């Protein structure tokens, strides 16, 4: 189900100049005044694909990656979509662009690996620790988190990289973009994985998008793993070994949300500092990647595809917008509860969250019916 011709695009056609120690994509300058994205994974995909003539919205990429199926394995600090490589694998298996992901191995990987993938002529993305992004103080001063940016150029002589960060949250929480240089040696200290398009991407039809969306909603409802076949996954055996070694059961989708919220009960017995920390992490995880993105992207997806989803799409939009507002209110309440050490609020928070999860499932089931009909 992979799209696109399996051939390498010459570097010269992609707007790049290269020599033995550097490569620069001049087209990246067009992104300097672009609107910031809503999430680093999908905004970096969006801008990378657009450079090759494929215009896809973040909401479409979110659906294509199956990212609505948030995962929970028993750690309240960790809740959200699958790991970065697995999301990209889901996208390719759903008929979307094929992207290869390689782990960055300390002491083995170096700048020549980055130069190699840049010279393939297709978009390159870096999954990094935010502390390595020394081009902005907000990354250096705050808690380290995973972040995805585009790599658009290298100058090995100057030891700089040209990057496009399309979802930079400043200290006030305002999203903006950064297009410019990054210190290469700092950057390489934090790379987790690097990824690149392996072939010319092709835009999916609305029917293909709807089929993938319906499939992933069914995953959300049932909690089942993906059953796609024929997608390269060099790390598959290692990932399975890692999962077996942890001995933890990963719950996905609706079941993942319910297990996550059920464990809020553990907050009541925590020491004060731990209580504050966990409430902040819960707030962060609901805000980025799970509930708030799910509802926002659902509304946007339906708005973009009303013509093919039919008049009932408006009802789903209204459900999504209402849910977004209520998740936002509850999430702020969780944040304030942590700051104020109001542990007695936890039963109320759990009850409100479970109600929202029920409404969320109802919304997605409505969308699943519409996408299944539109995919036929």
Stretches found by the model and what they are:
Residues 5, 10, 22-27, 249:
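Detector for intrinsically disordered, low-structure N-terminal pre-sequences
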Residues 5-6, 11-13, 238, 244-245:
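Acidic, Ala/Val/Gly-enriched low-complexity intrinsically disordered segments
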Residues 13, 17-56, 60-202:
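Conserved active-site-adjacent core of cysteine acyl-enzyme catalytic domains
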Residues 35, 203-207, 211, 251, ...:
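Charge-dense, low-complexity intrinsically disordered segments
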Residues 51, 117, 216, 263, ...:
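Residues that form generic nucleotide/phosphate-binding pockets
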Residues 282-376:
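Charged, long alpha-helical assembly modules
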């Amino acid at each position: 189900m992979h799209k696109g011709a399996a051939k390498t695009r010459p570097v010269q056609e992609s707007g790049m100049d290269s020599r033995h120690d550097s490569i620069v994509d001049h087209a990246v300058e067009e992104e300097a005044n672009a609107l910031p994205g809503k999430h680093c994974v999908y905004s970096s995909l969006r801008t990378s694909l657009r450079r090759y003539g494929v215009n896809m919205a973040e909401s479409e990429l979110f659906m294509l990656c199956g990212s609505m199926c948030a995962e929970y394995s028993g750690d309240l600090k960790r809740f959200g979509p699958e790991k970065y490589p697995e999301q990209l694998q889901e996208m390719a298996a759903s008929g979307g662009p094929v992207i290869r992901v390689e782990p960055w191995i300390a002491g083995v990987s170096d700048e020549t690996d980055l130069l190699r993938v840049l010279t393939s002529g297709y978009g390159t993305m870096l999954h990094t620790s935010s502390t390595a992004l020394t081009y902005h103080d907000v990354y250096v001063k705050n808690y380290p988190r995973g972040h995805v940016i585009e790599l658009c150029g290298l100058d090995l002589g100057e030891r700089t990289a040209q990057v496009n960060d399309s979802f930079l949250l400043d200290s006030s929480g305002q999203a903006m973009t950064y297009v410019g240089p990054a210190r290469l040696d700092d950057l390489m200290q934090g790379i987790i994985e690097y990824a690149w398009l392996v072939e010319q991407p092709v835009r999916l039809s609305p029917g293909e998008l709807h089929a993938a969306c319906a499939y992933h909603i069914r995953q959300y409802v049932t909690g089942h793993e993906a059953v796609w076949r024929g997608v390269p996954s060099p790390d598959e055996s290692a990932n399975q070994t890692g999962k077996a070694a942890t001995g933890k059961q990963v719950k996905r989708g609706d079941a993942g949300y319910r297990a996550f919220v059920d464990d809020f009960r553990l907050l009541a017995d925590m020491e004060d500092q731990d209580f504050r920390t966990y409430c902040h992490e819960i707030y962060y995880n609901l805000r980025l990647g799970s509930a708030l993105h799910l509802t926002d992207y659902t509304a946007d997806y339906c708005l973009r595809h009303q013509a093919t989803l039919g008049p009932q799409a408006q009802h789903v939009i209204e459900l999504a917008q209402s849910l977004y507002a209520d998740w936002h209110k509850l999430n702020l309440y969780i944040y304030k509860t942590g700051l104020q050490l109001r542990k007695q609020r936890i039963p109320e928070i759990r009850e409100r969250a479970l109600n929202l999860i029920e409404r969320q499932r109802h919304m997605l089931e409505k969308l699943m019916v519409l996408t299944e009909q539109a995919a036929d």
